[in-house]
């Protein structure tokens, strides 16, 4: 799983940072998901390692323009770039469906693929054989949701040599053991497939906070995550601005990461006021503020990526 940042700024784009958009790639599945779609997201995709034709799902955290205004253009471009009409699912807060219908009534776009809009509420909003997506209400000026993407535990590898040494013949019995079933050999021995499977591999967990003040709900959602992507619009000396606008400081995001017990924290959604390297407070200072509380912190950059690898049961990367 690879997280790629398409926009890491807040409010409006700058020469260095576009507004919010984050891609999550599933390499083996050949698909990817998008979290928020600020204006200019499809332009960023032209320089990113994702194809719009392989976009499978979009998750909108809330209906502020810097997280939403690129959506209609991207949906239209997906029609032009898709040779096959693969379906697309769009998840988001109440009002997203009305927003979409209003745009379509004023400026109709004929989509060449099925689009399903799903209005979310707290809890599990998507599940398949490998992935569960859940959300919690964050703390912002408008309804805003944080999303958690969790892989299910992966069955351990089948121990082929051990099965052969136990005298299991190739064929149906071998296959039954691989499925974890019990089998009876010709000599009467009963073998349990569970004894021939290695330790299960824990699934990965990635959490996207969206826009939020420090939130107990987001903290609970993030518990044990491999990666927490949390907004840090302001430095802590601008705490009053953060509170007034419904945002977090870098220090507050780091405290959330620490209390949630996450492995890594990546900060995003930065105010442009810290971009001036000659100013009183720089992005490096913002990072240092967070690292004082949670050392495993990094800053997101446009078109930068973070690879989240699956850990083995012994805690090591495979």
Swiss-Prot record:
What InterPro entries would the database entry show?
Metallo-B-lactamas, RibonucZ/Hydroxyglut_hydro, RNase_Z/BN
- Record's cofactor remark: Binds 2 Zn(2+) ions.
Reactions listed under catalytic activity: Endonucleolytic cleavage of RNA, removing extra 3' nucleotides from tRNA precursor, generating 3' termini of tRNAs. A 3'-hydroxy group is left at the tRNA terminus and a 5'-phosphoryl group is left at the trailer molecule
Catalytic activity, EC: 3.1.26.11
- Could you tell me one molecular function GO term of this UniProt entry? 3'-tRNA processing endoribonuclease activity
Which interval of the chain is the signal sequence? none
The answer to whether UniProt assigns keyword Membrane to this entry is: no
What positions does the entry give for Zn(2+) 2 binding?
Answer: 66-67, 211, 269
Which Pfam families does the record match to this protein?
Answer: Lactamase_B_2
Q: Which cofactor does it need?
A: Zn(2+)
* Keywords attached to this entry: Endonuclease, Hydrolase, Metal-binding, Nuclease, tRNA processing, Zinc
* SUPFAM superfamilies recorded: Metallo-hydrolase/oxidoreductase (SSF56281)
Subunit and partners: Homodimer.
Q: What is this protein called?
A: Ribonuclease Z
Question: What species is this protein from?
Answer: Brevibacillus brevis (strain 47 / JCM 6285 / NBRC 100599)
